[in-house]
């Protein structure tokens, strides 16, 4: 079935049909297309644009099509131009002329905008649910390891001691912001475009608010031209998905490092690891590596959407058909990554002794040494210089700050006393960092509980 016969004298060539068709990827929106059509038919009947009998006949027919697709009794014709054409054609086959009345005061331009919004509204909720599940795992693990000392890094160099729970909660905060972005994205997406028609609205006395309420939209679009031209909602959702993937990719990178024998901070469960075809000893963090790799795929989907839309004059152009494959792929990829990543993290075994051992090296407590001097009256820049000299002396002697003799300390600055050794112990370094947002164990426990409670309410 073609919806646009009449103007044309020739049949569409197979090449053109295959190239033009979107049903291989938009068929996933069959449910949304039918939901939108049921609401549209209901509105047409209530407004007297078609008879109540015709409206009821259409609705019954559409519900039958939906039931048959979902039961497998009806197969979607992959030779159809798109899912809208297939469903309208099937409806007309089943109920006759009333099926031809469905498209009154509607264009495929506003129909497809509606379908994509209906579909993506559900997907925003699905992604949010998966992100929240990951946040809960992070919060629980952070509470469990709120006293596990590890090195914090800058430039991938050991910098200052923290606790593992604090490190985990950094990702918890990132993901909480991602949830907020998803909510914002949904708020802007929640406008119903149906009634915009091709671009200039309609002469029929429709009531768009009826359709919006039936479909659960917060409001209707204000401008018919914008209603069919807009794909901001796809771009924004893809952008949020890209940011989520940035966070997952960074987390994956760290897990990959931590799993290596050079770190050995953690070990992934066998169920979330793979081996080598030639090296019997290997246990590879493939899930984390794939998440890291798939981030580029989602970024590419976002760039596809931006590039498709950047040069299109208003209103609809066929270029916009390319929006669906990109946004669908981005959604599918992120959902798959979250589905695999969360249980991988949940079952990951932490090795506290290796974290503690790593934190004991690299003069990670040097800042605390300088802070001790500052608290005892030495200007910070002088304290910084003195501590740097102590580190250099430790390197010469092959020792560390904890074991450097007090005489060496006093040779650099006579303010030093025995008390400095207590101040630079790793546990003391961490426990003293009690400023809000810091890694002191009691703060980390409280923050883990806060994040868990927030996640429970999302």
What name fits each language-model region?
Residues 40-50, 119, 166, 235-243, ...:
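Short, well-ordered beta-strand elements within core beta-sheets of diverse protein domains
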Residues 1-36, 97-98, 279-458:
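Glycine-rich cofactor/substrate-binding loops
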Residues 40, 61, 65-68, 90, ...:
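Generic, well-ordered alpha-helical scaffold segments in large soluble proteins
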Residues 128, 143, 151, 157-311, ...:
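Charged, flexible cofactor/metal-binding loops and thiol motifs
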Residues 1-201, 206-213, 274-275, 286, ...:
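A helix-coil-helix interface module used to build multimeric assemblies
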Residues 57-60, 225-230, 386-390, 425-428:
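Short linear loop/turn motifs
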